[in-house]
Swiss-Prot record:
Function: Non-catalytic subunit of the queuine tRNA-ribosyltransferase (TGT) that catalyzes the base-exchange of a guanine (G) residue with queuine (Q) at position 34 (anticodon wobble position) in tRNAs with GU(N) anticodons (tRNA-Asp, -Asn, -His and -Tyr), resulting in the hypermodified nucleoside queuosine (7-(((4,5-cis-dihydroxy-2-cyclopenten-1-yl)amino)methyl)-7-deazaguanosine).
Location(s) in or outside the cell: Cytoplasm
Assembly information from the UniProt record: Heterodimer of a catalytic subunit and an accessory subunit.
Matching InterPro entries: QTRTD1, Queuine_tRNA-ribosyltrfase, TGT-like_sf, tRNA_ribo_trans-like
Protein name as catalogued: Queuine tRNA-ribosyltransferase accessory subunit 2
Co-factor remark: Binds 1 zinc ion per subunit.
Origin species: Drosophila ananassae (Fruit fly)
C-alpha cells in the first residue's frame, strides 16, 4: 500500500492519494469505503451497484464478524490464485478487513486477558491472537486491522480504557511478529476510549514498531458501533481525535470506521482523518430514512432526512430529493417508496439504498472539492444549518415501525423490533 499526501491546509484537512495494490487504481482521500455484509453491499447485487450507483473502483469494507465462517473456503479459493474480492462478486476491487461490523451494535463485555470476543450471527466466538492471524491468513485481504480491544465509549471508566490498551498491546505484539503470514498491509489499532493518557500509550506502542511493519492506523473505541455512532457528543470526541492525530505520522493514512453523521465527518476531516465508510447510509436505509441533506447553497431550507414511513408523503408524486440524478429519484416518487414499505416489498430498500449511497458518495465528492479549495469550514456551516438559521440533527433513531402480515392492509403499526 502506498499513500501520498497531495496537500495539507490549516482549516480543511488534507488531500491524498491511496494505492492499495501494485498497479491498482489511484484512490483520492478523503476516501469512502463501501460497507458490506459478508462481502455484499446490503440490498444491492454487484451488477446493480455497478450500473446504478458507481462504475468507479470501490474499496470493499469487509468484517471478520461477517466473513469469519468463510475463512476455510476462502483459503481454497486463494490457493487457486484468486482473491477475496473475486469471491464476493467484485473482481478487481481492493478490500479492507475490519474486526467488527460498524453497522451493528457490538455487545459490551465478555473480555478476557488472552481472548477477544467476536460477535457473529452464530453467536459469540473467542479469538486469540493466534487464531485471529490464522483466519486473516486464510482470507488474505489487501488491508487488515490488528486485533484490538475496542470495548469502550464515552461512559467507560479510566480502568476499562487502560485495560483496552494493555490487552491490545499484548495482542499486537504477536500480530506484528506474525503479520508476514498475510500478504496485505497491517493497520495498527489505536484504542484507549476517551482517556488521553491511554490513547498516547496506544500510539507509543505502535510507533515503537519498525515503520515498515504497518501501513496506517485505525482509530477505534469511541462508540459501540451501530446507531451509537450517530449520536456521539462531538465536544468529547473531537478533542480526543485531535490529541491522537497530532502524535501520528503524516505519511500514514488514518481510518475511523463507524456511522458518523455528515457533520461529524466534516469535523474529523478537518482534524486530518482520511478514510471513512458508508455505514451511515446503511443505518439510514435500515431505519427507513432517505438522505436529503444538502451540501449545495440555495435559498430553500432543507432537512437531513425524509422518513418514507410517514403517511404525509403518500400522495407526494415528487422525487426523494430534487435535482438528484440517481435511478430512484429519476424514475420513482416519494409516494411510490412509501407504498413499497406499506406493502413490505423488497424493492423498497433496494431503491432507498441506491439513493442513499449515491447521495453520500456525491457528498464525499463535494468534500474533496472543498478540501482542495480550502473551503471546508464554509461547507461545514452549510451542512450544519441546511440553508436555515439553526443546527440540524443528523442522529438516527431506531425506527420501531414494522409491518405485520396480519395488518398489512392497515399499513405500519407501532411495535418493538
Amino acid at each position: 500500500m502506498k499513500f501520498v499526501i497531495e496537500s495539507i491546509s490549516k482549516n480543511s484537512g488534507r488531500l491524498g492519494h491511496l494505492r492499495i495494490r501494485e498497479g491498482g487504481p489511484d484512490l483520492k482521500t478523503p476516501l469512502l469505503l463501501q460497507t458490506t455484509k459478508g462481502g455484499s453491499i446490503p440490498w444491492l447485487a454487484g451488477d446493480v451497484f455497478e450500473h446504478q450507483v458507481s462504475q468507479e473502483p470501490q474499496v470493499l469494507e469487509l468484517t471478520l464478524s461477517n466473513m469469519g465462517h468463510m475463512a476455510d473456503a476462502l483459503q481454497q479459493w486463494n490457493n487457486q490464485g484468486r482473491g477475496v474480492s473475486d469471491y464476493v462478486g467484485f473482481p478487481g476491487n481492493p478490500n479492507l478487513l475490519l474486526l467488527r461490523d460498524p453497522c451493528e451494535t457490538t455487545p459490551s463485555g465478555s473480555n478476557d486477558r488472552d481472548i477477544q470476543p467476536l460477535f457473529t450471527r452464530r453467536g459469540r466466538e473467542s479469538l486469540t491472537a493466534e487464531t485471529y492471524i490464522e483466519m486473516v491468513a486464510k482470507i488474505q485481504p489487501d488491508i487488515f486491522q490488528g486485533l484490538s480491544d475496542a470495548d469502550t465509549n464515552a461512559e467507560s471508566s479510566k480502568k476499562r480504557a487502560q485495560k483496552s490498551v494493555d490487552r491490545t498491546e499484548k495482542f499486537m505484539q504477536y500480530i506484528y511478529e506474525q503479520s508476514g503470514k498475510v500478504r496485505g498491509t497491517l493497520l495498527a489499532p489505536i484504542v484507549g476510549g476517551y482517556n488521553t493518557f491511554a490513547r498516547t500509550q496506544s500510539i507509543k506502542h505502535a510507533r515503537e514498531q519498525p515503520a515498515e511493519s504497518y501501513g496506517g492506523y485505525v482509530l477505534e473505541g469511541f462508540h459501540n458501533n451501530g446507531l451509537s455512532a450517530t449520536s456521539l457528543d462531538t465536544s468529547k470526541l473531537l478533542p480526543i481525535v485531535e490529541h491522537c492525530v497530532k502524535q501520528l505520522e503524516e505519511d500514514k493514512p488514518r481510518i475511523i470506521p463507524g456511522a458518523y453523521t455528515p457533520l461529524t465527518v466534516l469535523e474529523l476531516i478537518r482534524l486530518g482523518i482520511d478514510v471513512f465508510d458508508t455505514s451511515y447510509a446503511y443505518c439510514a436505509t435500515h431505519n427507513f430514512k432517505a438522505l436529503t441533506f444538502t451540501f449545495v447553497k440555495n435559498e430553500k431550507e432543507d432537512k437531513p432526512f425524509l422518513d418514507i414511513t410517514d403517511d404525509t408523503i403518500k400522495e407526494e408524486f415528487t422525487p426523494l430529493l430534487r435535482d438528484c440524478s440517481c435511478l430512484t429519484c429519476q424514475k420513482h416518487t416519494r409516494a411510490y417508496l412509501h407504498h413499497l414499505y406499506k406493502t413490505n416489498e423488497l424493492l423498497g430498500p433496494i431503491l432507498l439504498m441506491i439513493h442513499n449511497l449515491h447521495h453520500y458518495m456525491a457528498f464525499f465528492e463535494r468534500i474533496r472539492e472543498a478540501v482542495a479549495n480550502d473551503t471546508l469550514p464554509a461547507l461545514t456551516e452549510l451542512v450544519k444549518t441546511q440553508n436555515g438559521k439553526s443546527s440540524s440533527d443528523f442522529s438516527i433513531v431506531q425506527n420501531t415501525k414494522v409491518i405485520s402480515k396480519a395488518t398489512m392492509s392497515k399499513g405500519f403499526v407501532a411495535a418493538a423490533v
